[in-house]
């Protein structure tokens, strides 16, 4: 926005950004692709958030028309010379498990991201509307936030069904702050750089580290831990 404002062109643009969890680190992505290639050979096609699976026609990918639940939008389809590989978070795919652990994001996500949650330089922000409000909606609901009057006017000029909610509802499932660059992140970076470890071995190391962190956190807060135990027993 500062750039177009500098040249007095701001009125010629509508700026849009996205609710963003982060981007996977290149180290993690390369490690994952290396593992996938063992199954399907050289990769020739890749579709992020693929909504349709086809097990038969590798050209169109849509013969079976198996609709993917929008809640399962963490979904990646990779086509290779020997077949295809469908990666879904709901099926426990290691790529998404690592990504959502916030320990394997790109460096800039930890150091330079200024636009989490309600911070933006755009007129409009879009994304998926996660959260309790539409938890049982099977068709999918898009979130659109107008940060400026121009953004608000444009949204209402579009041929859309608009239901207004508070920002807290719209952004309920979104990250509020940058992820923390802690010791676990540094540890994962070292593991991802090792040629002798595949991505599944690295994920197992992460699980061990997370379990250790959970136990230590409980030991550091015995009163809170006991209250939680009693609450579970009470149920």
Describe the residue ranges of each PLM region.
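Classical protein tyrosine phosphatase
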Residues: 2-3
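A short alpha->loop->secondary-structure connector
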Residues: 6-18, 39-40
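Functionally engaged cysteine thiol sites
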Residues: 17-20, 31, 109-113
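Short, amphipathic alpha-helical segments
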Residues: 19-23, 103
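Short, charged, surface-exposed secondary-structure boundary motifs
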Residues: 22-32, 56-57
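Acidic, Ser/Thr-rich peripheral helices and adjacent loops at domain boundaries
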Residues: 34-38
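Long, compositionally biased charged/polar accessory segments in the mid-to-C-terminal portions
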Residues: 41-235
């Amino acid at each position: 926005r500062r750039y177009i404002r500098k040249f007095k062109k701001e009125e010629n643009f509508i700026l849009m950004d996205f609710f963003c969890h982060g981007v996977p680190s290149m180290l993690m992505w390369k490690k994952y692709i290396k593992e996938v290639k063992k199954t399907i050979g050289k990769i020739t096609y890749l579709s992020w958030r693929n909504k349709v699976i086809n097990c038969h026609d590798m050209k169109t990918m849509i013969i079976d028309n198996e609709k993917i639940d929008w809640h399962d939008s963490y979904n990646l389809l990779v086509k290779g010379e020997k077949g295809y590989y469908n990666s879904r978070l709901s099926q426990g795919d290691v790529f998404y498990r690592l990504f959502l652990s916030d320990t394997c994001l790109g460096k800039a996500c930890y150091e330079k991201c200024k636009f989490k949650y309600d911070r933006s330089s755009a007129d409009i922000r879009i994304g998926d509307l996660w959260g309790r409000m539409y938890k049982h909606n099977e068709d999918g609901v898009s979130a659109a936030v107008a940060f400026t009057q121009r953004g608000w006017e444009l949204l209402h000029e579009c041929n859309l069904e608009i239901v207004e909610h508070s920002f807290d509802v719209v952004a309920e499932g979104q990250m509020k702050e940058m992820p923390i660059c802690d010791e676990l992140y540094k540890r994962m970076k070292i593991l991802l750089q090792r040629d002798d470890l595949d991505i599944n071995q690295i994920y197992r190391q992460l699980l061990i580290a997370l379990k250790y962190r959970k136990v230590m956190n409980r030991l550091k807060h015995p009163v809170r831990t006991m209250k939680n135990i009693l609450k579970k027993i009470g149920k």
